[in-house]
């Protein structure tokens, strides 16, 4: 479906051409002076030099050719040569009627759908999710949803960290605590127990204990390193323990991610990439990409245009051990083999930028990806407390993600009960829905690359640019529609009529921008654009609501038009929040 601005640009381009100028000057954009006009064309300013003519004279010629246009209700030249435009109420109403019929509400579906793998989430197993895991999960989830909405095949991969020293630490600590377990008996040849010798809460206590010991006791650390090495060599007892650790951890991770309304298509792990490493390293050596430097195996990735030093990409340490770079490169090999993606996008902390520059350059230089495969990195900023430092508990520790969610839910529950609009038995469920919106919108409304302050009081407010405010707007629309139906109204009756007042036209204009906004949000990997858009739509609707007697409107055709407009507004808002990864309750 064409954008509203496409129709306008067609009119302007034809008017430029008819006046003897190049049609390419007919581009139209949203006005930066809404007090003067809704849209503007600056083509006359751009064309003045080429035609050696004053821009206001060019603009005058063009405006003269728009006299019979049905698209514009206002078209005027403003010196030094701007063309100010207002769309006609009739044309705008017709455009919204087309939007109503369109499954995608005016957003274009990709003409050439791409296969995109998004690497997000990325927690280490055997450790609880904490607030530092929040951003990758919810930004990646939103980008995945937006990509699918515009027609691409998007594959979400959690990419678990399961193959590093933390495994050796857990195995070593278990051996100290329960040396009698069969996993540590080298002579044991039977089947290993089906049930894990620990619960998730015990596992989450074992790791920090072992990590602390390894920092104080070098002999303990060496044992853990040896256990890691034996695991990676495939020692049966250790592999059985690793399977238990994975099973218990992944079950808990899935529960926590479900509470965030985040899901993954793949639960791939670092260990899945290990089989690809030997052949990959051998290829890089044979083709002369990899060489030894102080015992380590590296690949040069610096480029002449670099403005800062980019160190070589290290493949193997001097003891032959692999690193994160090795695993990430092998994972690219695996993804190319399994999915042949057009793009692989990593949603990770921006402090990992250098790592991914090295990995991407190494993958390209050594031919791990096709020339047209896009490798991209969305580095997000830090979630900080009100003090501007990384978000912590009141005691100064790292806050678990489930505790943050519980705190926000409790805050929302208190506010909803105070509001008394929902019965107590429903208030808990509503608080969870609204609490999740508060968290996700609070994060996603910020540009991903920037640090932001996680302000619980502001994020849980029903006023201002917040998730609860957006949901309150949707619930308000639902309530009006329910009352209309209860009074015998038919939601399918009538059609959207031309706007009868300024606030109604402003709402219609905001709705008409959905398609352009979605395409921009996907191209720029920018969920914050959806947040900014639905905040404007919500404000426009609430202004319209306060200025318009909707249900008490006596003219039946006008009332039906309002109801159709409300349904479209609800659909646009609900589609948008689904792309952000949350939903609206029926009451709040």
Go through each PLM region and give its residues.
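Non-catalytic interaction-recognition regions
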Residues: 1-93, 107-588
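Short, charged, solvent-exposed linker or helix-capping segments at domain edges/interfaces
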Residues: 94-99
